[in-house]
């Protein structure tokens, strides 16, 4: 039997276990069930073929939490072999990836039951299962991380087609759905896919694909990726190795690898095109053009592109300035307010915000639509400026929060760790690292205190996991 046929047959056995143990109750369509079986089998294939990808989970977890996996008791754990805890974690991740508005308990009894049976199958097969030489040879290539083009291809594979990629793939598909479908859709989608491969951290340990592959291949090197936003550039010089570009906004001169420009587009250089709008990616000290470019000579197109860039840069500058103002004048890293009068007084009298026409009505509408009984907490960070937490305020145990309520917090504090709609990632990290969500707990058949300890022992991991999409 060929290696492919062996693992296909094994995946069918895993699928049968998922069906018989009730996983279909949460993965409610046949495609999702088959996909889960394939991913779990691919994990086993990785374990049997050098344990290259999954070893990163163990390494990073030890670095961050002092044990080989989050959530589970690993006192009886054997790295590089089939472990029920590994299968539980991966199956939990697969199931959780399908739920945006529901938290699945990693100790879910159905997941544990399925993982136990699957682990038994893998244990039986472990000594005789074939290694996948193609995967081992692919990851053993010494240039897979250092060479930009090989690295880009590997990152696309990891972010969309590896057994660890489900959340990353779902995110990209959702991003495609949000785009207007017009003549530019496929060009935009191509760029989005490439950039996603470089910057997404939607994997179990919240690393980028490059970081994961670097660790998996045991190459001790720093991966320096600079994600530059779309920009406008004037072409100053075309060379054999690099283009010399000038940023149309900042005036900064940049050298970009010539090989990264589309060969068909290069022919249009003869037409005298001197300005382009594109995405640049910095990889290990060199700049590459990534995705599609706009090189329309019409003045109105250029002005429209530049306007969008200026607006984005202005928002970034305002965020940094707002953060500095908050740090200087707020009086505390987090401030609790209630009602429109307190909210406006804090903005105008404390932070020095100028009250423009309609400011009060705008703030009243915001509090009415977003806050619970007019209660909000305010913070800041340099990337987003002022941050407002508008829900579950009584769940925050801070010395200066007059509305903290333990009974309320026991039911609602978890939301502030996992629901990005309620607050920014920076705010969630601040609350966790400063011990302000001590009552957060998962519902557990073993009681509230067990569910609380499960969350508290894995609080930072949970924030990073559930907010990963919103910190890319």
Show where each model-derived region lies.
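A short macromolecule-binding patch
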Residues: 252-260
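Short aromatic-glycine-enriched beta-strand elements
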Residues: 241-246
């Amino acid at each position: 039997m060929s290696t492919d046929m062996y693992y296909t047959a094994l995946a069918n056995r895993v699928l049968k276990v998922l069906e018989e143990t009730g996983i279909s109750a949460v993965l409610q369509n046949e495609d999702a069930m088959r996909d889960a079986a394939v991913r779990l089998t691919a994990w086993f294939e990785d374990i049997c073929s050098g344990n290259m990808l999954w070893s990163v989970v163990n390494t990073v977890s030890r670095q961050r939490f002092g044990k080989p996996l989050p959530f589970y008791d690993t006192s009886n754990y054997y790295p590089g072999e089939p472990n029920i805890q590994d299968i539980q974690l991966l199956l939990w991740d697969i199931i959780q990836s399908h739920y945006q508005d529901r938290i699945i308990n990693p100790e879910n009894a159905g997941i544990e039951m399925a993982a136990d049976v699957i682990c038994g199958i893998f244990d039986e097969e472990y000594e005789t299962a074939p290694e996948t030489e193609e995967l081992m040879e692919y990851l053993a290539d010494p240039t897979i991380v250092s060479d930009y083009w090989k690295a880009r291809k590997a990152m696309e594979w990891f972010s969309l087609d590896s057994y660890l990629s489900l959340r990353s793939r779902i995110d990209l598909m959702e991003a495609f759905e949000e785009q207007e479908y017009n003549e530019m859709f496929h060009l935009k989608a191509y760029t989005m896919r490439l950039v996603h491969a470089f910057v997404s951290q939607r994997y179990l340990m919240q690393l980028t694909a490059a970081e994961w592959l670097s660790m998996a291949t045991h190459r001790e090197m720093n991966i320096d990726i600079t994600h530059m936003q779309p920009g406008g550039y004037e072409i100053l010089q075309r060379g054999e190795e690099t283009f010399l570009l000038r940023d149309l906004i900042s005036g900064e001169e940049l050298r970009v690898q010539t090989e990264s420009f589309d060969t068909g587009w290069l022919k249009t250089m003869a037409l005298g095109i001197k300005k382009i709008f594109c995405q640049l990616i910095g990889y290990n000290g060199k700049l590459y053009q990534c995705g599609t470019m706009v090189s329309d000579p019409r003045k109105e197109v250029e002005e429209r592109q530049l306007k969008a860039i200026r607006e984005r840069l202005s928002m970034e500058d305002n965020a940094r300035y707002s953060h500095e103002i908050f740090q200087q004048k707020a009086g505390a890293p987090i401030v609790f307010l209630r009602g429109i009068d307190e909210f406006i007084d804090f903005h105008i009298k404390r932070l020095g915000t100028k009250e423009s026409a309609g400011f009060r009505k705008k703030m009243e509408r915001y509090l009415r639509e977003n806050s619970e009984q007019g209660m909000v907490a305010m913070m800041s960070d340099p990337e987003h400026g002022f941050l407002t937490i508008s829900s579950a305020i009584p769940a925050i145990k801070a010395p200066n929060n007059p509305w903290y309520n333990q009974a309320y917090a026991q039911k609602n504090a978890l939301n502030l760790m996992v629901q990005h709609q309620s607050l920014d990632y920076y705010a969630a990290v601040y609350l966790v690292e400063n011990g302000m969500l001590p009552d957060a707990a998962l519902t557990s058949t073993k009681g509230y205190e067990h569910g609380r300890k499960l969350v508290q022992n894995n609080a930072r991991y949970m924030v990073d996991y559930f907010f990963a999409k919103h910190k890319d």
